[in-house]
Amino acid sequence: MSRKCELTGVGVLYGNNVSHSQRKTRRRFEPNLRSVKFTSDITAGEYRLSVNARCISSVEKAGGFDAYILKADDNVLSSNARAIKKKIIQTKTAKSL
């Protein structure tokens, strides 16, 4: 399992620990990933995704999982999230016809 958010694409960053004497040692900054179950109102399904903690509040602010994933750019979404987005779009167009 990669250390990457499936909705925002945020991954591991690299930097330095810097001591008081200015010695620098390499370190990793890992995202605060959580396994969250999102419910889609359009498809009436539940989807479990690995997302960072900031993304959870972004989804709520956008008006829910469906609104967030429909606005999201396909380049940052994981392949699993792109498949969910495609399913939501297909269901939405089928309901509107």
UniProtKB/Swiss-Prot annotation:
Transmembrane segments: none annotated. One of its GO terms (biological process) is translation. One of its GO terms (cellular component) is ribonucleoprotein complex. Gene3D superfamilies: Ribosomal protein L28/L24 (2.30.170.40). Pfam families: Ribosomal_L28 (PF00830). Keywords: Ribonucleoprotein, Ribosomal protein. One of its GO terms (molecular function) is structural constituent of ribosome. SUPFAM superfamilies: L28p-like. Belongs to the bacterial ribosomal protein bL28 family. HAMAP family: Ribosomal_bL28 (MF_00373). This is Large ribosomal subunit protein bL28. It comes from Rickettsia massiliae (strain Mtu5). The gene is rpmB.
